[in-house]
UniProtKB/Swiss-Prot annotation:
It comes from Sus scrofa. Keywords: Metal-binding, Metal-thiolate cluster. The keyword Nucleotide-binding does not apply. This is Metallothionein-1D. A divalent metal cation 6 binds at C37, C41, C44, C60. Residues 30-61 are annotated as: Alpha. Gene3D superfamilies: Metallothionein Isoform II. A divalent metal cation 5 binds at C34, C36, C37, C50. A divalent metal cation 1 binds at C5, C7, C21, C24. The gene is MT1D.
């Protein structure tokens, strides 16, 4: 279990508008929890539940 998410890492979890998960991949809605990307990163906006602002985001690497 991810200590900050009510699901197993890699399992399904509820994807709200914000997420405090560290490594939980929300397979139930095909989104992952990660830092927000800079504006203009469409890939992150479509496949990420933001947990905090960052100019470096794994979704956009």
């Amino acid at each position: 279990m991810d200590p900050n998410c009510s699901c197993s890492t890699g399992g399904s979890c509820s994807c709200a508008t914000s997420c405090t998960c560290k490594a939980c991949r929300c397979t139930s809605c095909k989104k992952s929890c990660c830092s927000c990307c800079p504006a203009g990163c469409a890939k992150c906006a479509q496949g990420c539940i933001c947990k905090g602002a960052s100019d470096k985001c794994s979704c956009c690497a």
